From Swiss-Prot:
Co-factor(s): Zn(2+)
CDD domains in alphabetical order: M14_ASTE (cd03855)
Catalysed reaction equations from the record: N-succinyl-L-glutamate + H2O = L-glutamate + succinate
Gene assigned in the entry: astE
GO MF: hydrolase activity, acting on ester bonds; succinylglutamate desuccinylase activity; zinc ion binding
Family, as annotated: Belongs to the AspA/AstE family. Succinylglutamate desuccinylase subfamily.
Family annotation (Gene3D superfamilies): Zn peptidases
Protein name (Swiss-Prot/TrEMBL): Succinylglutamate desuccinylase
Annotated InterPro entries: AspA/AstE_fam, AstE_AspA_cat, Aste_AspA_hybrid_dom, SuccinylGlu_desuccinylase
Pfam (any one): AstE_AspA_cat
Active site: E224
Pathway: Amino-acid degradation; L-arginine degradation via AST pathway; L-glutamate and succinate from L-arginine: step 5/5
Length: 344
């Protein structure tokens, strides 16, 4: 495996050729500047001999059909392996769900991005590939962050694409972080990366980004980089700014960020999450409605169990509507413009 990676510089191809696991860990050096460690299929660490004080996790492919972030990360990995760019920050890349990527599907058995913060081991336990992999991914993040000295900035960008069109093509979800202000610098970094819209979440979740934020104090985000397309059919020119800023971050080049300015970004706060309680749950709007579509107060969003679910605020925007989830799962997130968000 080591020789195959050294020859091809294509970590994604190696991962997809061995989607369940590698035959053990291996490591090698790039020149006299970087140690590379491969911990598992889809798990590769770049450890600069001299680093600048940030620990960065870039994860992709938690959902197997969300291919643009996978191609973006593989491009960065390839450039690092080819020594076209040199890491100056400790960086962990995670290709989340190789089995689903090979299958060309979002999941194999279960939505992995609902299985973190230990949810993978709650009943029914480690009964499917997503649950097993989520537990491993948590362990790799823990190993990576705890191997470095305390006091360093920890960053985790969990990269996705959405199943539907969006009023805001690229947007990020800022996990709930009670007692900690939101980072204006991080929001402006995202804006410079082409991600000009941020949603402030209002409660704990079992997503990958919340896990890193809550457990390790990381500046963590779930980042949606556009719409789902098959592998090889993404217009990668739409990700030039994202690639450039991630490259600058990894190589410790000047980020040249603007000071935080709420007028330069779109800021929303989650006002509620609507979960499914009955099999007859259905939305009143079209199934192909775009993310961030806004509805006025009193509008009937959905019906279930003989009850109507109405818009409660003057206007609410919806993201990730999906009526076909299991009972107990989230059907939609409702948003209002952010008011008095603690951004510093």
């Amino acid at each position: 495996m080591l020789q195959a990676l050294l020859d091809s510089k294509d970590f994604l191809a190696l991962t997809l050729a061995h989607p369940e696991q590698f035959d053990g860990e291996f490591s090698f050096n790039l020149g006299d500047h970087t140690q590379v460690e491969v911990w598992d299929t889809g798990v590769i660490v770049f450890e600069p001999i001299q680093n600048e004080g940030k620990d960065i996790v870039l994860s992709c492919g938690v959902h197997g059909n969300e291919t643009a972030p996978i191609e973006l990360c593989n491009s960065l990995i390839k450039q690092l392996l080819q020594q076209k760019i040199i890491a100056k920050q400790r960086t962990l890349f995670l290709i989340g769900n190789p089995l689903a990527i090979n299958n060309g599907t979002r999941i194999i058995d279960e939505n992995m991005n609902r299985l973190f913060s230990g949810e993978h081991s709650n009943p029914p336990g480690l009964v499917n590939p997503e649950r097993v992999r989520a537990k491993k991914l948590e362990a790799y993040v823990d190993r990576f962050f705890t191997a470095a000295a305390d006091g360093r900035q920890r960053i985790h960008y969990d990269l996705h694409t959405a199943m539907r069109a969006s009023k805001h093509e690229k947007f990020a979800i800022y996990p709930y972080r009670p007692g900690r202000a939101f980072s204006g610098e991080q929001i402006m970094f995202l804006a410079a990366s082409g991600v000009d819209t941020v949603l402030f979440h209002h409660e704990p979740t079992t997503t990958f980004s919340y896990f890193s934020s809550e457990r390790y104090g990381a500046d963590a985000f779930t980042i949606e980089l556009g719409k789902v397309y098959p592998m090889g059919q993404n217009d990668m020119t739409r990700f030039i700014a994202t690639h450039e800023m991630f490259m600058r971050l990894i190589t410790a080049k000047p980020l040249e960020l603007d000071a935080f300015d709420a007028d330069k970004v779109n800021l929303y706060q989650v006002c509620r999450v609507i979960n499914k309680h009955f099999d007859d749950f259905e939305f009143t709007f079209a199934t192909d409605v775009e993310n961030f579509r806004s509805f006025p107060k009193g509008f009937v969003l959905a019906r279930e169990g003989g009850q109507e679910i109405k818009v409660e605020h003057e206007f609410e925007s919806v993201v990730f509507p999906n009526a076909k989830v299991p009972i107990g799962n989230r059907t939609v997130i409702c948003l209002i413009p952010a008011v008095n968000a603690d951004v510093r």
